[in-house]
Amino acid sequence: MDSKLFALEVLNNYQRKKIDESNDEEFYSDPKFVYHLDANFRQNLSDLYEREIDNYSTVLDLMSSWDSYLPKGKKYKKVIGHGLNKQELEKNKIFDSYWIQNVNSSKQIPLYKESVNYCLMVAAWQYLQYPENLTKEIARILSREGKIIIAFSNRAFWHKAPNIWTSSTEEERVKYVRKVLISNGFNEPKIIKKFTEPALNIFNFLNKDPFYCLIATKE
């Protein structure tokens, strides 16, 4: 049996459970035209994309919304969007196409093998109940030397995040994402962490979202 064809499970059943097991499509049925990450995080991400993504590439923005944070000056062959809310995806003008799918209930990505150069996931991994299967699918659709770029902070809709995320420290989350990646078709990821010293005021108005990013190349 070829192990490359099957996802290697990392989580147990308890770790996949969520506080709110209700339908995800219903929760995301109303568009949320707000930024879930602060301006500093978004700038860090755009700067990283500027460095990491080659011009004339095909990019998949998985579990996306109305803004992809992709640099406007870069030239893309194609940008494909995915998410759960049609209105949000329609507003994202950088998309050449998009589709709607709940990856927790339907794990196969409807794209051809080796058809994408980069897969982006922003503030998304924390909602995956079956990350192993999805990671294997991402490896399938990525081109040779294709990359996955996963970015997250310490924010989430906590009732919709599985136990593995809500019960872990920030450092444990990084280790968990890494383990899934290297177990399911990716090389050792590059890990980026950026923190800002707490602002010296009692209200912490100037504190910034921590920035975590894992970049891994397909095996």
Regions found by a protein language model. Name each.
Residues 185, 199-219:
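Core SAM-dependent methyltransferase catalytic element
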Residues 147-178:
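Conserved class I S-adenosyl-L-methionine
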Residues 106-119:
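A short acidic, Gly/Pro-enriched loop at the edge of an enzyme's catalytic core
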Residues 117-132:
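A short SAM/SAH-binding and catalytic strip from SAM-dependent methyltransferases
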Residues 132-147:
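A short glycine-rich, Lys/Arg-flanked "PGG" loop and its adjoining helix->strand segment in the class I
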Residues 44, 168-193:
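Short alpha-helix
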Residues 2-54:
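Class I SAM-dependent methyltransferase Rossmann-like catalytic core
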Residues 51-109:
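Class I SAM-dependent methyltransferase SAM/SAH-binding core
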